[in-house]
Amino acid sequence: MSFTGRTAVVTGGSRGIGRAICLELARRGANVVFSYAGNTAAAEATRKELEALGVQTRAVQGSVADPAAVKTLIDTAVKELGSLDILVNNAGITR
């Protein structure tokens, strides 16, 4: 299934399952906006991998427990990439 021209938002997208979801969406043509809690190096590495697949991508730092951060995430997708077509709520707590 192709997602070309669609914009996906993935919470917790810089590592683990979230990263894998971001990469698969990008392989299928989706532009990807993802959130990350605090590991800037992991977020930057994921962003570069997504760009190498030829899609537009944005990494937005913030917690999904913070309504203002969630608004920023959604606003980034809509304002910078034009829409929000796919939402993957993946963020979790690593203990």
Give the location of each predicted region.
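A glycine-rich helix->loop->beta "capping" turn
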Residues: 3-4, 53-56, 75-89, 95
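Conserved glycine-rich cofactor-binding loop
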Residues: 7, 12-16
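Conserved Rossmann-like nucleotide-binding pocket used by diverse enzymes
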Residues: 9, 33, 58-60, 80, ...
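Aromatic pocket-lining residues of Rossmann-like dinucleotide-binding sites
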Residues: 25
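Conserved glycine-rich Rossmann-like NAD(P)H-binding loop of the short-chain dehydrogenase/reductase
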Residues: 28-45
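The beta1-alpha1 cofactor-binding region of Rossmann-like NAD(H)/NADP(H)-dependent oxidoreductases
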Residues: 40-41, 61-75
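Short, conserved SAM-binding/catalytic segment
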Residues: 46-54
